[in-house]
């Protein structure tokens, strides 16, 4: 312990003061020295008591801090990972406490909601009175489930209609599989769709076959006139100026027209049957040949085509063949209005060198030596006609020149 300097004896090295004897100190006052000594001793004792008090208090504080740190470390380990990822870097103690508080609040809200639902269900079951909305929802769910089940049963039966060894266990297995697919999140069908019938599955192949009978990819229908004109203009399909493609106005006109047309015999034909001429687009343009290079065998049409032509048989829905004006002499052009009005309802048939049967048939009743002028408008010839010997185009032109001109003012 620290000693007070006044209480210590003087050092031995210092010599005693001369002339100081105990008798001389009797008259001196040492009261101030006693007071100082007493006060110092009291201060020392108070400091010792404080040190003895701080020592256990520090230990207690250290233990308390250790417990707090341990609890914060455990909270950090118990926090969910998604909350830990919201912060970057090291999680401080304050951040851990904030995240813990947030997580506890979320759990408390969830528990409160579940508790409210449980109370509502218990009150509803006790009262035994369900609201009308819940009843309607239950009925809709039942109806949708029943329709889905019936649809699956019909589809399964239609698919396995021909199988004789169909068992109920197979149907039940199929329904269980469908239910599992729906529960797993598969796309459920709309309950408003009507249940398919077995006839629908039978009609599908026929409809597919009908769809495949349409025109090909590269086929474009040629635009034709569907009615015969009473004027002297050339009717039919104009292949010199027609490109095979119609504009918007022509498309709208075709949509407005009636889809059915009546023939002379009363039979109705659709637009697809009337337009039988198809122009096919090829990659390379065909080589053009002059009319003088065409032989009898290489004519534009064969005898089978002539038999099925509208001139030789009653086929009003087939496209007519037209005769260009430059092949008819001027004297014969006067007969075009009469022929177009009375003799044939459509355009004049074509006359070329390769058409042996048509040229012979036309010359047989247009020759004035055999048939008179009033008989130039006969009825339609039956198909097919007997084959006549071929004649030259010059002979045909001479026969046309010999026909006497008719009066254009004659009534039909």
UniProtKB/Swiss-Prot annotation:
- List Phosphoserine occurrences by residue: 235, 383
Q: Which domain of life is it from?
A: Eukaryota
Question: Glycyl lysine isopeptide (Lys-Gly) (interchain with G-Cter in SUMO1, SUMO2 and SUMO3) crosslink - at what positions?
Answer: 159, 279
- Locate the Orange domain: which residues? 142-175
What are the annotated GO cellular component locations?
cytoplasm; nuclear body; nucleus
Q: Where is the bHLH domain?
A: 52-107
- Where is it localised? Cytoplasm; Nucleus
Answer whether the UniProt record assigns the keyword Nucleus to this protein. yes
Q: Where is this region: Essential for interaction with BMAL1, E-box binding and repressor activity against the CLOCK-BMAL1 heterodimer?
A: 1-139
Point out the cross-link Glycyl lysine isopeptide (Lys-Gly) (interchain with G-Cter in SUMO1) in this chain.
Answer: 279
Spans annotated as Disordered:
1-21, 182-256, 279-298
Q: Which GO terms describe its biological process?
A: circadian regulation of gene expression; circadian rhythm; entrainment of circadian clock by photoperiod; negative regulation of DNA-templated transcription; regulation of circadian rhythm; regulation of neurogenesis
Region ranges (Necessary for interaction with RXRA and repressor activity against RXRA):
75-79
UniProt keywords, alphabetically: Biological rhythms, Cytoplasm, DNA-binding, Isopeptide bond, Nucleus, Phosphoprotein, Repressor, Transcription, Transcription regulation, Ubl conjugation
Q: Does the keyword Repressor apply?
A: yes
What does the UniProt record say this protein does?
Transcriptional repressor involved in the regulation of the circadian rhythm by negatively regulating the activity of the clock genes and clock-controlled genes. Acts as the negative limb of a novel autoregulatory feedback loop (DEC loop) which differs from the one formed by the PER and CRY transcriptional repressors (PER/CRY loop). Both these loops are interlocked as it represses the expression of PER1/2 and in turn is repressed by PER1/2 and CRY1/2.
**Oligomer and partners:** Homodimer. Heterodimer with BHLHE41/DEC2. Interacts with TCF3/E47. Interacts with ubiquitin-conjugating enzyme UBE2I/UBC9. Interacts with HDAC1, SUMO1, RXRA and BMAL1.
Q: What is this protein called?
A: Class E basic helix-loop-helix protein 40
Organism of provenance: Bos taurus
**Underlying gene:** BHLHE40
């Amino acid at each position: 312990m620290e000693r007070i300097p006044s209480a210590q004896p003087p050092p031995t090295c210092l010599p005693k003061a001369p002339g100081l004897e105990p008798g001389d100190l009797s008259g001196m006052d040492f009261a101030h020295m006693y007071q100082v000594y007493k006060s110092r001793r009291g201060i020392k004792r108070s400091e010792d008591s404080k040190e003895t008090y701080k020592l256990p208090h520090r230990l207690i504080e250290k233990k308390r801090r250790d417990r707090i740190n341990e609890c914060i470390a455990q909270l950090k380990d118990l926090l969910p990972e998604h909350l830990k990822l919201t912060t970057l870097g090291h999680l401080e103690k304050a951040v851990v406490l904030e995240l813990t508080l947030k997580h506890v609040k979320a759990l408390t809200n969830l528990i409160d909601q579940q508790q409210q639902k449980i109370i509502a269900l218990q009150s509803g079951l006790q009262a035994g009175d369900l609201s009308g909305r819940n009843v309607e929802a239950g009925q809709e769910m039942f109806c949708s489930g029943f329709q889905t089940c019936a649809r699956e049963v019909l589809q399964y039966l239609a698919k396995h209609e021909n199988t004789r060894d169909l068992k109920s266990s197979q149907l039940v297995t199929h329904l269980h599989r469908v239910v599992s697919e729906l529960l797993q999140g598969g796309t459920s069908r709309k309950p408003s769709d009507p249940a398919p019938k077995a006839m629908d599955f039978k009609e599908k192949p026929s409809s597919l076959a009908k769809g495949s009978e349409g025109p090909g990819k590269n086929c474009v229908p040629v635009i034709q006139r569907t009615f015969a004109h009473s004027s002297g203009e050339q009717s039919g399909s104009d292949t010199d100026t027609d490109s095979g493609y119609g504009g918007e106005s022509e498309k709208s006109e075709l949509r407005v027209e009636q889809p059915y047309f009546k023939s002379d015999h009363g039979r109705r034909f659709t637009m697809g049957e009337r337009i039988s001429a198809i122009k096919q687009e090829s990659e390379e343009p065909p080589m053009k040949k002059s009319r003088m290079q065409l032989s009898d065998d290489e004519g534009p049409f064969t005898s089978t085509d002539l038999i099925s032509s509208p001139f030789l048989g009653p086929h009003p829905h087939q496209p007519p063949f037209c005769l260009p004006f430059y092949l008819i002499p001027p004297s014969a052009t006067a007969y075009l209005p009469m022929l177009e009005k009375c003799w044939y309802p459509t355009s004049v048939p074509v006359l070329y060198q390769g058409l042996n049967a048509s040229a012979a048939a036309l010359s047989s009743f247009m020759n004035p030596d055999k048939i008179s002028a009033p008989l130039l408008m006969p009825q339609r010839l039956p198909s097919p006609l007997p084959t006549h010997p071929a004649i030259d185009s010059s002979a045909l032109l001479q026969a046309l020149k010999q026909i006497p001109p008719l009066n254009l003012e004659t009534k039909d």
